[in-house]
Each structure stands twice: as structure tokens, then as C-alpha cells.
Swiss-Prot record:
PROSITE patterns: RIBOSOMAL_S27E. Belongs to the eukaryotic ribosomal protein eS27 family. Its cofactor is Zn(2+). A zinc finger (C4-type) spans 17-39. SUPFAM superfamilies: Zn-binding ribosomal proteins. InterPro entries: Ribosomal_eS27 (IPR000592), Ribosomal_eS27_Zn-bd_dom_sf (IPR023407), Ribosomal_zn-bd (IPR011332). This is Small ribosomal subunit protein eS27. One of its GO terms (molecular function) is structural constituent of ribosome. Zn(2+) binds at residues 17, 20, 36, 39. It comes from the Archaea. NCBIfam families: PRK00415.1.
Length: 62
């Protein structure tokens, strides 16, 4: 018997805001623009698949 499994390719990433150095966890395939909760600068822009992350990625969570 063949068992089909679907591997999850999306993940959460911890990023550092380039303007205020705030660390924030975001989804790497965000479908809405993600802004920093402290200063309001744009951290990620949706592209139809993976989001274009404009901040420094610190860690990725599986």
C-alpha cells in the first residue's frame, strides 16, 4: 500500500525590521502586506506565492 504524504513547504520566519530593529514573526507566504508593529515600515509584500521579504531573516521555523 502506497501512502501519500504532502510536505508543508510554507513556514514562519523571524525577521528584524531594518528601521527600528524590532524582531517580529511573519508568514513566508503572506497574502497581505506585512508592516512592522512598532514603526509601520513594510516588511513583506505578497507576490502570488512566496512573499518578498524586505527585512533581515533571523530564523526560520519549520
Amino acid at each position: 500500500m502506497v501512502q501519500l504524504t504532502r510536505e508543508n513547504r510554507s513556514k514562519f520566519v523571524k525577521v528584524k525590521c531594518p528601521d527600528c530593529e524590532n524582531e517580529q514573526t511573519i508568514f513566508d507566504r503572506a497574502c497581505t502586506p506585512v508592516d512592522c508593529i512598532v514603526c509601520g515600515s513594510n516588511l513583506a509584500t505578497p507576490t502570488g506565492g512566496k512573499a518578498q521579504i524586505k527585512a533581515e531573516i533571523i530564523t526560520a521555523f519549520e
